Amino acid sequence: ADAQLEVLANVTEDQLPLLDEYLSAAEIAVSKSPLRCPFDIQVRVFAGGDTAFVQIVGSHTNVVRIEKNGEVLLNKPFSEEAAQPPESRRSLTVEDIIAFADEVDLDDVRAPIARQIEYNTAIAEAGLTGQYGAAIGKILLDSYGDSVQNRAKAWAAAGSDARMNGCEKPVVINSGSGNQGMTASLPVIVYARELKASEEQLYRALVVSNLVTIHLKTGIGSLSAYCGATSAGAGAGAGVCYLYGGRYDEIAHTVVNALAINSGMLCDGAKASCAAKIASAVEAGLLGMQMYRHDSQFYGGDGIVVKGVENTIRAVSSIARDGMRETDNEIIRLMIGEETVK
């Protein structure tokens, strides 16, 4: 439990064949959790005469119960209400985010933003030079050329190609997700280079993209059948818009347009196709920005769009958090083989 997301950090290359042997020989049964909580993992293992049980609920590192041979070693109560994000996140608005990005002392954010630029750029480069997954980043560059818009999609996708398919390079995350951290940052970095933006402009734009992504994710929760890349792609569009000189009006419309375009995308787990979904999400964010630059926008009443950026964000959050619960259940049933497609 103390290792959190690094429980596999000490696995060596020599041990990998042993893992393959174990997986091919062990009896592993998977079933759907009976809890209504969208994030519940219960694992029970047997070895010789010993048994162990671990339960994680609500978030990726929240271990609430540990048992060994029937003895309870940890029992921590959990409720969905207690797992709500802090008030500081729930009170965010797009307008406040932009004001903060304009005024923040960069020394207060320099360390994490600098790491995000360094680490996320490095793994994107690995995805573009190595052979990982479906190679979506490489395919985008080979197929659609070297425009800044295509490079923004390709670099974000390439980072996911590597991340989802075994690359051990670190990533600076957003909302608990490496994919969302790369999606929110890499397009902004690519555009900053193209526009020859100063370091200060890049850092402030990344503050916008990261905080908009967090704002969009806050109402959805840590896990949903709604693809989190959609939120990060809208955040990236907001950050790029900021680089072009956009402020509240332009960024608010960019976010609304992006959410209207891409909010139907499903999450069906972390795997190679995430890279293609990221490319789609970045495309939606950039198109949302270009729409407003060309005096075009979606209006309240256009499908799920509600007048006002905060109202649209709340509407999308409601769909993702509550409306897609049964979608999540159906996806899980299909993935674990409880239901077959007829």
Predicted regions mapped to residue ranges:
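Alpha-helical support elements that line or immediately flank enzyme active sites
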Residues: 1, 181-198, 237-245
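Conserved phosphate/anionic-ligand binding catalytic regions in large, soluble enzymes, centered on
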Residues: 1, 169-186, 227-231
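Contiguous domain-boundary segments centered on the initiation and propagation of an alpha-helix
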Residues: 3-46, 194-200, 206, 210-213
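Functionally critical mobile loop/hinge segments
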Residues: 3-10, 17-18, 37, 45, ...
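Signature of multi-pass transmembrane helix bundles
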Residues: 20-166, 333, 337-342
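Acidic-glycine-rich active-site phosphate/pyrophosphate-binding loop
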Residues: 147-166, 198-216, 256-264
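Glycine/charged-rich beta-loop-alpha catalytic/anionic-binding loops adjacent to active sites
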Residues: 162-173, 213-223, 267-271
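Helix-loop-helix junctions within the multi-pass membrane cores of secondary transporters/permeases
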Residues: 198-220, 225-243, 249-251
